[in-house]
């Protein structure tokens, strides 16, 4: 009987492993308490059935909320009992003033980007306008310079032709006057006018210049169709007295309508 009781006692005693200070629990079928998701949060079972030993749970909170506590819980031994690794977390709402600074920063960055873009566009527009205005100014200067050059060449041509015509008419008047009894004779004037009219048929000018010169002669003399060479002309020059210079503009249709007997204009001296 004594040997039998000693054997039973030896079997009932727990055996200790060498190098291990924690005894192996006798109860290997422990479970953890059932957990529920926090208010306005969710619960996800990653491993296990939610209460058995070795179960892993993950908690989630929606946007605008902050989790207070650990979001990962595990069912494990805690000493001689089975319990969760930490307490159940809570989802706490984030106050609005905490997100106000972030919103202000985002709005300020957007506004600054828009201002930079507008300033860049304004700068580019001003540069383009300046380039266009500079090109237009150069073109206008070139046009004006060319117009003045052409105008000066036309004036030199007209003056050269007029000076040559005046010398030729003076020679004709001298020759005709000498043949009719001298320059003071009364019979020399018709011959002078005839030779002048005959010689001036070969001298033509632009109709626009004719109209401009006709307006000038009208302001100088009472008769717009005659201009005496003894009087000073618009250019300030005068010629010998008693000589008339007539300029006829040749037209393919003949003389001007309504005034067949008179020339269109006289060239002033």
From Swiss-Prot:
Record's bilayer topology term: Single-pass membrane protein
Membrane-side (Cytoplasmic) residue stretches: 125-269
Region (Disordered), start-end ranges: 1-23, 171-237
One Pfam family, short name: Sushi
Signal sequence residues: none
Disulfide-bond pairs as recorded: 32-75, 61-91
Record-annotated Sushi domain positions: 30-93
Cited PROSITE patterns: SUSHI
Keywords: Cell membrane, Disulfide bond, Membrane, Sushi, Transmembrane, Transmembrane helix
GO CC entries: plasma membrane
Name of the protein this chain belongs to: Sushi domain-containing protein 3
Organism: Mus musculus
Lineage of source species: Eukaryota, Metazoa, Chordata, Craniata, Vertebrata
Primary gene name: Susd3
């Amino acid at each position: 009987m004594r040997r039998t009781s000693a054997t039973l006692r030896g079997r009932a005693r727990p055996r200790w492993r060498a190098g291990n200070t924690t005894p192996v629990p006798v109860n290997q079928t422990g479970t953890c308490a059932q957990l529920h998701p926090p208010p306005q949060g969710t619960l996800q079972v990653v491993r296990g059935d939610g209460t058995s030993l070795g179960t892993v749970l993950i908690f989630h909170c929606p946007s605008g909320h902050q989790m207070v506590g650990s979001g990962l819980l595990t069912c494990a031994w805690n000493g001689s009992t089975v319990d969760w690794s930490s307490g159940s977390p809570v989802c706490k709402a984030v106050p609005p003033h905490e997100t106000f600074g972030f919103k202000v920063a985002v709005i300020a960055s957007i506004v600054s980007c828009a201002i930079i873009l507008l300033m860049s566009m304004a700068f580019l527009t001003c540069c383009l306008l300046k380039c266009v205005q500079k090109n237009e100014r150069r073109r206008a200067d070139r046009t004006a310079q060319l117009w003045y050059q052409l105008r000066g060449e036309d004036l030199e041509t007209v003056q050269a032709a007029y000076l040559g015509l005046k010398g030729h008419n003076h020679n004709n008047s001298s020759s005709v006057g000498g043949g009719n009894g001298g320059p003071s004779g009364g019979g020399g004037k018709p011959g002078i006018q005839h030779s002048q009219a005959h010689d001036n048929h070969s001298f033509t000018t632009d109709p626009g210049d004719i109209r401009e010169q006709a307006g000038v002669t009208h302001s100088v003399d009472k008769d717009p169709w005659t201009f005496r060479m003894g009087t000073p002309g618009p250019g300030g020059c005068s010629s010998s007295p008693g000589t008339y210079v007539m300029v006829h503009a040749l037209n393919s249709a003949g003389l001007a309508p309504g005034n067949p007997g008179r020339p269109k204009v006289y060239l002033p001296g």
